[in-house]
């Protein structure tokens, strides 16, 4: 008989029973509770250790095994469930199963379990489910709020939630501050960030490293270098993230290049460990600087520290060298990289346009799939008409891969086809774009305008204005089209002017210059001057536009005054400016002043004269009768004289009756462009004026033999006064194509007689 049975049987010995049995029962209960706690701790430790070793599958397996053994409730608790949910790592199916089990077993009443469930749904991409659970929590803690806050992907919604947290009296912790500050972008977000900074002291987190780093990032992203630096300097302890946050923010801003380099230097002096973020940030800074030497020094440091072959560092180095046009350095970095992605290959394609297609093929062979930026680089590599077939192949590949509907790709195709005058293909590319931005419309309008299709440009502008909001480049292109179109009424330009005034775009230099140029080319120089005077900021383009306007109107004195004022304002003239000034000198017959300006362009501003500059000088000398000097200057033109220069020289030979030189120049012009009538007509007139009729007849005979005919000259008249008037009526000498031509000729005769009676001279 056991002692226990004995004690039960012998009740008379109650003292012994109480003495021995009661302590045994208590000890058994204590032992059972202790072993249960130890078992729970052991299971939780096993799951936690698996997670620490990045083995979520093993963690879930341990949870499942113990669940099957029926240990839940005895050896597993709310901590076990939290760890199991953490192990799901976005596995929605298992997460939902554990969530269901937590609900049926009543463990969702523990706020930590609900937090874990919300975290699981957030990681699985089911943020709505997490939000629904949160809204039904009776007493959410700060972790609950933080879990939801970290799940937002919209800055404004996240900031509204932060305001809600403040209103609910939630005491922010370091995670709350760092997460909230990551959403503080833009002016509204920055203001909220400043408010949060004022509350940090109250929570005692002003010295927290994570919070300090978050404030540095917020200030840096908002472009407040002083604010970021102040937070940085006030931090009692700084880690590598602190330095990198300051450095990265400055490099992205782009206007604090020098400061970023100084901070990088200080990091090295302080012995702070540099990582790939440090190097990519400072190299990005070099992209904003013109000092290539600095970039090479940092590159050398990358090599010493073993970071050159890293993907992020290699890509940013390639980008830097590409922007500087150092192709060999781009290639060198590319070949040193141990890993390459689409950014690496795309940079190579964009940098090396001559071999862009072969690089693209190697990229595909390497198993890297292109993106829209890759195709934009490929399209831009098509440089001449002979390569247009390559462009068509690229277009076909874009159609197959679906990138043709991407706006950036479509816009590049529009620009490409417009450059090579393939406007039907440009229209097709435009129609293939699914969501047309204003850039797409601008590309089409500009393409039509540049190719002389002014009516189409105007119609495209009207369609764009009906569908989207035009910007300064839209107006710049359409005004350019109107400026050069003699058969479009100037009223259309005035309507565009009124439209852009309503949109507040009149202060944009691009728009003002286009307006100024349009009015000048259409004969309204007073309106051009008015636009110019109303501009608060005048850049090189604006000055050139007003000088060109007065030059086209033959106002030499005003041109020279504006030119000298431009220089006095420290605005450097460019080739177009000098061409306009030379044109004014030519029309005024100021040859010596023209020579002075021509030499200034070369010697003072180091500008290489173009064919147009030489042509203007040759014409200027020729008109002044200095034909020998003109001939000598013509022989100095790089690549030889062009057709327009020869025509100009031929006109001067006719003006001064130099038959011998005229014949020589005409022969060169006819060899260059045998199909054009200008040289034949000019030479015929030279012979006719000298009464050398036999030679004049030979010119006529040569024209008939080569089927060369003189092109008819056209004039235009604006007769429309209605709002819908888009065009002007064109006519040529002796033109009778109009159905009312007889009435028109009679009216012209009457007007001519009336002009004579008024003392006016008809021209």
UniProtKB/Swiss-Prot annotation:
Q: Where is this region: Type E motif?
A: 645-720
Q: Which GO terms describe its cellular component?
A: mitochondrion
PPR-type repeats, residues: 77-109, 110-140, 141-172, 173-207, 208-238, 239-274, 275-309, 310-344, 350-370, 371-405, 406-436, 437-471, 472-507, 508-538, 539-573, 574-604, 610-640
Keywords, comma-separated and alphabetical? Mitochondrion, Repeat, Transit peptide
Q: Which GO terms describe its molecular function?
A: RNA binding
The record's section on InterPro entries has: E_motif, Pentatricopeptide_rpt, PPR_At4g14850-like_plant, TPR-like_helical_dom_sf
Subcellular location(s): the record lists: Mitochondrion
**Key word Mitochondrion present:** yes
Pfam families per the UniProt record, alphabetical: E_motif, PPR, PPR_2
Give the stretch annotated as transit peptide in the record, renumbered to this chain. 1-38
Q: Where is this region: Type E(+) motif?
A: 724-756
Origin: domain of life:
Eukaryota
Q: Name one GO biological process term.
A: positive regulation of mitochondrial mRNA catabolic process
Record family assignment: Belongs to the PPR family. PCMP-E subfamily.
Q: How is this protein named in the record?
A: Pentatricopeptide repeat-containing protein At4g32430, mitochondrial
């Amino acid at each position: 008989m056991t002692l226990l049975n004995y004690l039960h049987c012998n009740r008379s010995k109650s003292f012994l029973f109480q003495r021995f049995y009661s302590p045994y029962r208590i000890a058994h209960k204590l032992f059972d509770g202790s072993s249960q706690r130890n078992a729970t701790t052991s299971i939780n430790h096993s799951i936690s250790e698996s997670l620490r070793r990045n083995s979520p599958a093993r963690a879930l397996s341990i949870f499942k095994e113990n669940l099957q053994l029926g240990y839940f409730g005895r050896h597993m608790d709310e901590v076990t469930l939290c760890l199991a949910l953490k192990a799901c790592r976005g596995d929605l199916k298992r997460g939902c199963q554990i969530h269901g089990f937590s609900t049926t077993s009543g463990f969702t009443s523990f706020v930590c379990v609900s937090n874990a469930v919300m975290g699981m749904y957030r990681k699985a991409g089911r943020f709505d489910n997490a939000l629904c659970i949160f809204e039904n929590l009776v007493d959410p803690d700060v972790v609950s709020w933080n879990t939801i806050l970290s799940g937002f992907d919209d800055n404004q919604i996240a900031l509204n939630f932060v305001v809600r947290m403040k209103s609910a009296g939630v005491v922010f912790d370091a995670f709350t501050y760092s997460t909230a500050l990551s959403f503080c972008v833009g002016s509204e977000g920055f203001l909220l960030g400043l408010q949060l900074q004022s509350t940090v002291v109250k929570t005692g987190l002003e010295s927290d490293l994570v919070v300090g780093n978050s404030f540095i990032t917020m200030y840096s992203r908002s472009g407040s270098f002083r604010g970021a630096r102040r937070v940085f300097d006030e931090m009692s302890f700084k880690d590598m993230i602190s330095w990198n946050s300051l450095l990265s923010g400055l490099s992205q801003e782009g206007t604090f290049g020098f400061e970023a380099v100084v901070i990088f230097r200080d990091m090295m002096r302080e012995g702070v460990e540099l990582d790939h973020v440090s190097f990519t940030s400072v190299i990005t800074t070099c992209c904003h600087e013109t000092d290539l030497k600095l970039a090479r020094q940092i590159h050398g440091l990358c090599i010493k520290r073993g970071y050159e072959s890293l993907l992020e560092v290699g890509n940013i180095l390639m980008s830097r060298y590409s922007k500087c046009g150092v192709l060999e350095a781009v290639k060198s970095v590319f070949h040193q990289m141990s890993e390459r992605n689409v950014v690496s290959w795309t940079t190579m394609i964009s940098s090396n346009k001559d071999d862009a297609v072969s690089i693209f093929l190697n990229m595909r062979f390497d198993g890297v799939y292109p993106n829209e930026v890759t195709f934009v680089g490929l399209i831009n590599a098509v440089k001449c008409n002979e390569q247009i077939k390559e462009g068509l192949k690229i277009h076909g590949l874009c159609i197959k891969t679906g990138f043709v509907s991407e706006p950036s790709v479509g816009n590049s195709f529009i620009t490409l086809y417009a450059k090579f005058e393939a406007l039907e293909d440009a229209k097709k590319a435009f129609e293939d774009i699914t969501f047309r931005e204003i850039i797409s419309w601008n590309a089409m309008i500009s393409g039509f305008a540049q190719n002389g299709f002014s009516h189409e440009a105007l119609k495209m502008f009207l369609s764009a204005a009906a569908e989207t909001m035009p910007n300064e480049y839209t107006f710049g292109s359409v005004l350019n089209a109107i400026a050069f179109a003699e058969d479009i009424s100037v009223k259309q330009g005035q309507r565009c002017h009124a439209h852009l005034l309503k949109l507040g775009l009149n202060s944009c230099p691009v728009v003002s210059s286009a307006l100024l140029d349009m009015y000048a080319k259409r004969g309204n120089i007073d309106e051009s001057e008015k636009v110019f005077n109303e501009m608060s900021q005048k850049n090189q383009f604006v000055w050139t536009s007003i000088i060109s306007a007065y030059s086209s109107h033959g106002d030499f004195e005003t041109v020279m005054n504006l030119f000298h004022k431009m220089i006095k304002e420290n605005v450097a003239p460019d080739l177009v400016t000098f061409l306009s000034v030379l044109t004014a000198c030519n029309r005024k017959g100021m040859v010596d002043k023209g020579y002075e300006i021509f030499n200034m362009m070369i010697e003072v501003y180091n500008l290489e004269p173009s064919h147009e500059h030489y042509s203007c000088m040759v014409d200027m000398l020729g008109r002044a009768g200095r034909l020998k000097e003109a001939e000598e200057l013509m022989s100095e033109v790089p690549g030889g004289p062009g057709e327009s220069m020869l025509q100009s020289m031929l006109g001067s030979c006719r003006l001064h009756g130099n038959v011998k030189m005229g014949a020589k120049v005409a022969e060169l012009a006819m060899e260059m462009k045998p199909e054009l009538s200008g040289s034949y007509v000019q030479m015929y007139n030279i012979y006719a004026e000298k009464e050398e009729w036999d030679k004049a007849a030979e010119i006529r005979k040569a024209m008939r033999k080569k089927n060369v005919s003189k092109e008819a000259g056209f004039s235009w008249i604006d007769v429309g006064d209605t709002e819908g008037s888009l065009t002007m009526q064109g006519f040529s000498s002796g033109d009778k194509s109009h159905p009312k031509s007889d009435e028109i000729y009679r009216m012209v005769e009457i007007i001519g007689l009336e002009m004579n009676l008024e003392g006016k001279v008809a021209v």
